[in-house]
Amino acid sequence: MGQPVQVQFLSPAFTSHWTDDVHLMSAPVTRRTFAVDGWSPSSWRTRSTLQQPEWIDPGALRASCADLARLPPLVTSFEIEALRTQLAEAASGQRFILQGGDCAETFDGCEPGSIAARLKILLQMSLVLVQGGRRRVTRIGRFAGQYAKPRSSDMETRDGVTLPAYRGDLVNGPAFTAAERAPDPRRLVRGHERAALTLNFIRSLVDGGFADLHHPEYWDLEFVKHSPLAAEYQAMVDQIGDGLRFMETLVGVSVAQVHRVDFFTSHEGLVLDYEEAQTRQVPHRAGWWDLSTHFPWIGVRTADPEGGHVEFFRGIENPVGVKVGPSTDANALLRIIARLDPYQTPGRIVLITRFGAHAIAAHLPKLVEAVKASGRPVVWICDPMHGNTETVIPQSGLGKGVPVKTRKFGHILAEVEQAFEIHRAAGTWLGGIHVELTGENVTECTGGARGLSDEMLAQAYHSAVDPRLNYEQALELAMLIARRMSK
């Protein structure tokens, strides 16, 4: 199941991790940094930068950014380097990346049950992938900072009233009132606080044995009874237990290391005031580090080679993700990669593809071939969620006649399967998946082992923005991917 690694987190309550940046490196690093050609944490301000809030009070914004700059960082450069090493392994097929979490976190969602449920499903999915794929798995949570969302329109109109669009709790509130929708820079500090609390709680859970495979009550596989693959699913879980017992018999003691796992955080680097305020230099390490997260990514709407987001992220030392969709031009993508990674650094660039099951075959092969021909090392990850979003109108049930966004489980799985095949044919690796999920029993995506229908969506539809896989669907997806990887 790969070499277990201890989890490391940082929050204001665990400042000992900040000393990693002071003590773990005995001499300055001589590696070239990415902060070249006139880059600074604020150089993005000279570029056209999309999807930024229209802050009403510049003084309040300056005060909030100053507060952020004084607060302890959320992650360390040591952890970021560790992730980059693991991403480099994924690029060559030695490792698989599991990135998942909420579409958009909310401040109210920072509560123990919700956090524990998300951690639980990611841990269980990763164990299934390790067992089925026979590869080490890196777990990256899409949380502890995923509080901002891009919008297709700056404004929203209801019943003749027009207000700013809801851009996530980092910017404004969801309620349709002038007070709630006004962009409030004080929310930037609240976002940092919620992220720190989330990291602190996750660390305490893992330290306390939450990831311990010796506790069968953490595994809820009731849903497999609804699937024709039930026997295969149960056998996979049994094999994990058998492997653990074999290791313990072999060494004669309990394998304590499996109580702790490595875990990283990620979010879309959208609001650059927030990112800039937490970008710092650290002792004994070269370059600038975005210490708000281990792994930021650039969305499709902001992936402009000459735009502010690419300008900002080209100068930090973190690995950087880039969302790639049907509108992505191969030449523009190569320009983005060249700007973000002039040194062709393994583990630096992660391309997260989001086409939809209906479009992936028409778009992904030519992009894969273009990047492969360039010789640049990248990690390819499949996001099977965003390209498969659709709006349906249930014909019966609680939500009868009301349009609702959803995703079909069959389409999600089909996009992943096509991605595997396209990379196999091209001689490249699918290095991971990027999914929106929750560990709770929501009804937002249709299909899966229970056969959720459009008419059942209103029973438990709680997403703030886009539909997510529920616990059962997420674990079923992991098992089906593991089955595909084992072929």
Language-model features, listed with the residues they occupy:
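Short, positively charged low-complexity motifs
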Residues: 3-8
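Long, contiguous, compositionally biased segments that the model treats as domain-scale units
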Residues: 9-172
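A residue-identity detector for tryptophan
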Residues: 18, 39, 44, 55, ...
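Glycine-rich, charged/polar anion/phosphate-binding loops
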Residues: 82-84, 306-309, 336, 365-367
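Active-site-facing alpha/beta catalytic cores
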Residues: 104-105, 110-356, 401-407, 415-416, ...
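Non-transmembrane, aqueous-exposed alpha-helical and coiled segments at domain scale
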Residues: 340-342, 348-379, 386-442
